[in-house]
């Protein structure tokens, strides 16, 4: 019930609507640009987080490795948003993501908080009626599950 209070049905519906605007199939290049802007914002506010992405060639933003990572992050978030009303599958997937991130040295709760802040700063720039409160309530709930065992 606590999850319901923090990310209500109305919040989930609003988030899916917002995300549909960002994620429509006609905007494939825009998706990568948005996630790149999110990472740029993250690195601006949390510069030490940049070292976590050396494996995906963060210093070569036009590389296939980095663009592929951006797509994976965006697709992962897309999946989570589309699972917001399927609690059992969502919880299973969040557990999987938590396991993946606990294995990555240097990943912290603070960086997850930072990427949430970055999305909240970037998305209003590309969406005219972005509901930051609904976004934060749902995004923070998802991140809390993924980052629960991180330092």
UniProtKB/Swiss-Prot annotation:
Residues 6-151 form the Globin domain. SUPFAM superfamilies: Globin-like. The keyword Iron applies. Keywords: Disulfide bond, Heme, Iron, Metal-binding, Oxygen transport, Secreted, Transport. It is found in: Secreted. One of its GO terms (molecular function) is heme binding. Disulfide bonds join 7-138. Belongs to the globin family. The extracellular hemoglobin of the earthworm consists of 12 subunits that have a hexagonal bilayer structure with a molecular weight near 3.8 million. Each one-twelfth subunit is composed primarily of disulfide linked trimers (chains A, B, and C) and monomers (chain D). This is Extracellular globin-4.
